[in-house]
């Protein structure tokens, strides 16, 4: 039995499963769970994981502490007595906001549809609880209706998931990062409980002597419900304790298997904070990385690189009033606690929700540069049909959903088991139904084996297996897809330079593969160490170039999607051109549809100007340390709030005069075209810098 098989034989998924269940013990809310950033429950769980790392034989086990904003959510219980005298008690979920009562306190509750600005017209909600129904996956995030309610004077907003999340059952609650201020309170209520409240509102209205509404009509749209049910209110009682704790501490728990040939490291990461029980997200992942560590130790594996196992705190949330308020623990680990990991860690294998099949086909999502190596690895796997009938694939680039993004922008090439596209997200994610009932043993076993093998495969490398041609091809494709004729000279220069650097990157990758293959032929320990030392500088330069590529090329749009620098302006130009053409033809409706897709201007249609302003400015003009991994990733913004409101007014006019609005759109279009040209020039400069770095690496590789 070879060493890999020996380690695989030591895998015990029952041990991992039981550890995942033990992580559920500590909770801030005794009924619902929650193990939140900086809370006593998170700290106690971290202490347990610290002891577990020691017990399985990891060395240098540490609690790496850092500052963050914490949250303790103890309870949110809503009581209501209906017209028949029946008392109802509803357990509500929480968000990272401040709200404390002295036992049960009485409130007036109103229902306001989707909670957009129009729903508040003619309503006085001061001091009241405002119940709304939202779809965070397909429409807007919780932060917008919450802040809208706060500005109108509401005591708190109660959000019901209409669709998008928590679809598994009408009793499902949901939790997400608030991405907003802590002084605008919010809670989560299930559809089933909301239906009881809505029925009582409907009954009150029906009881009015001048009303003929059918009290049993449950087929209304949200808009119809909002128009009807806003005419009444209910008396309810709320007992809640949700407390945000600014500037507290949390800790990432790390342990190691010491390397024998190099100071470089391979990192495995998962987060141990959670909403509700968090069995899949992310107990099963933390338990899996420790299960893999345990198997490697028991199997007697002596790695060349130091293997680091890190249970991250505060992935779900960790900073007040920031759009980029998640992945707090990971960002702090590599930028503040251990900046020395940058340039030393050759790969981060991050894990999310790994004990459930999110699709018929499994996927490893990774940075562009590692895609070829990962694909070669997955081609060697035998994937059990009972886990994934359609096998396994490789996806790029990484996304912002999880800690691997923070790792990548720090210059650490990262991967994650892909989880974001499957039905689990709509049904179970961040709800009380993410529990042991969604456990799939075959999937968990396969992931233990797959990633143990991947660790060993990476550990056998001398040089990071980076193919920068994948990155450059992706940049070129993004330009070809949306080429703009007014910038042809700049685009053509860039595309030629991309062809040059792509060829160079392919040559480098071929050489990297050759060097890694040569190392594999060495059996003498001293010869292997000497061979690694010979190529150490080249490895450092590859990681340095990767970090620069992340700095130069990775940007975000207003929906947190990973894009290249010119893509935001390119999309805006297309939409502004559509809007301008539509207005020239007097078609305000189509113009507004196009403007809806420019940057974050969908919110200009739906919410008060202060809401739009707040959630724009807190990205553009907030200290970098509060933007963390999102700092500097959005470069431009086109504020269309005024013109959107004006065009909505014009729609009410019989023969609207649109010359002024057309000129304003033309000005916006000129700005975006200038941004686009600047972005293309910036890209060209960046590609030239990266090309020079790659040329130096290639010359270094040829010099030995």
Regions found by a protein language model. Name each.
Residues 2, 10-14, 18-21, 25-126:
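Noncatalytic luminal/extracellular "stalk/propeptide" segments of secretory-pathway proteins
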Residues 3-10, 30-40, 111, 133-139, ...:
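Second-shell loop/turn segments in exported
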Residues 4, 89-122, 178-280, 290-301:
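Soluble metallo-hydrolase cores and metallopeptidase-like ectodomains found primarily
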Residues 91-188, 385, 389-393:
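Extracellular/luminal Protease-associated
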Residues 124-125, 145-155, 172-178, 330-340, ...:
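Mature extracellular/periplasmic domains of secretome proteins
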Residues 137-144, 148, 249-252, 274-369:
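Acidic/histidine-rich catalytic neighborhood of metal-dependent amide-processing enzymes
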Residues 161, 248, 345, 353-477:
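Active-site-adjacent substrate-binding region
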Residues 449, 459-704:
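C-terminal non-catalytic alpha-helical accessory regions
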């Amino acid at each position: 039995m070879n060493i890999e098989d020996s380690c695989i034989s030591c895998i015990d998924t029952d041990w991992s499963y039981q550890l995942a269940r033990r992580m559920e013990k500590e909770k801030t809310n005794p009924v619902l769970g929650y193990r939140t950033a900086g809370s006593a429950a998170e700290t106690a769980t971290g202490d347990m994981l610290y002891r577990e790392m020691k017990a399985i034989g990891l060395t240098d086990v540490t609690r790496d502490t850092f500052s963050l904003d914490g949250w303790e959510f103890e309870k949110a219980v809503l009581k209501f007595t209906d017209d028949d005298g029946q008392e109802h008690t509803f357990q509500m979920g929480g968000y990272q906001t401040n709200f404390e009562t002295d036992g049960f306190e009485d409130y007036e509750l109103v229902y306001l549809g989707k909670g957009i600005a129009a729903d508040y017209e003619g309503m006085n909600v001061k001091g009241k609880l405002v119940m709304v129904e939202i779809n965070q996956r397909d429409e807007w995030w919780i932060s917008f209706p919450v802040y809208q309610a706060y500005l109108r004077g509401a005591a708190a907003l109660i959000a019901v998931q209409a669709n998008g999340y928590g679809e598994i059952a009408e009793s499902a609650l949901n939790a997400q990062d608030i991405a907003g201020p802590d002084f605008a309170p919010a809670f989560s209520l299930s559809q089933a409980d909301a239906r009881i409240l809505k029925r009582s509102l409907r009954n009150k209205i029906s009881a009015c002597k001048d009303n003929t509404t059918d009290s049993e009509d449950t087929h209304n749209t949200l808009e119809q419900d909002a128009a009807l049910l806003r005419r009444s209110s209910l008396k309810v009682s709320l007992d809640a304790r949700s407390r945000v704790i600014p500037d507290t501490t949390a800790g990432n728990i790390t342990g190691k298997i010491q390397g024998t040939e190099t100071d470089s490291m391979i990192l495995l990461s998962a987060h141990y904070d959670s909403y509700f029980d968090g069995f899949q997200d992310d107990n099963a992942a933390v338990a899996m990385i420790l299960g893999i560590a345990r198997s490697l130790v028991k199997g007697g594996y002596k790695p060349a690189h130091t293997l680091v196992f890190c249970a991250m705190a505060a992935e779900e949330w960790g900073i007040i009033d920031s759009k980029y308020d998640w992945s707090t623990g990971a960002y702090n680990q590599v930028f503040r606690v251990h900046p020395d990991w940058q340039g030393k860690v050759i790969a981060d294998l991050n894990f999310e929700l790994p004990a459930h099949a999110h699709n018929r086909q499994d996927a490893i999502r990774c940075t562009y540069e590692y895609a070829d190596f990962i694909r070669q690895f997955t081609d060697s796997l035998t994937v059990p049909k009972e886990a994934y009938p359609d096998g396994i694939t490789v996806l790029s680039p990484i996304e912002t959903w999880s800690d691997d993004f923070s790792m990548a922008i720090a210059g650490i090439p990262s991967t994650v088991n892909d989880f974001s596209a499957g039905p689990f997200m709509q049904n179970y994610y961040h709800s009380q139904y993410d529990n042991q009932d969604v456990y799939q043993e075959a999937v968990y076993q396969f992931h233990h084996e797959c990633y143990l093998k991947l660790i060993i495969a990476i550990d056998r490398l001398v040089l990071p297996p980076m193919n920068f041609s994948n990155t450059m091809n992706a940049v070129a494709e993004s330009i070809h897809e949306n080429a703009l004729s007014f910038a042809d000279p700049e685009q053509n220069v860039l595309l030629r330079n991309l062809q040059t650097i792509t060829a160079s990157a392919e040559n480098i990758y071929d050489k990297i593969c050759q060097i890694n293959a040569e190392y594999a032929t060495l059996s003498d320990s001293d010869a292997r160490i000497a061979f690694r030392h010979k190529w150490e500088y080249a490895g450092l330069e590859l990681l340095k170039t990767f970090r620069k590529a992340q700095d130069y090329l990775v940007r975000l749009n207003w929906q947190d999607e990973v894009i290249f620098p010119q893509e935001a302006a390119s999309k805006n130009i297309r939409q502004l051109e559509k809007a301008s053409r539509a207005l020239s033809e007097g078609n305000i409706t189509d113009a507004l549809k196009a403007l809806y897709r420019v940057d974050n201007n969908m919110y200009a249609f739906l919410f008060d100007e202060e809401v739009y302003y707040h959630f724009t400015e807190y990205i553009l003009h907030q200290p970098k340390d509060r933007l963390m991994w999102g700092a500097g990733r959005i470069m431009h913004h086109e504020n269309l709030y005024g013109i959107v409101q004006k065009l909505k007014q014009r729609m009410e006019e019989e023969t609207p005069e649109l010359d002024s609005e057309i000129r304003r759109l033309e000005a916006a279009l000129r700005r975006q075209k200038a941004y686009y040209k600047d972005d293309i020039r910036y890209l060209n400069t960046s590609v030239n810098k990266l090309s020079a770095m790659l040329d130096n690496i290639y010359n270094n590789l040829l010099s030995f």
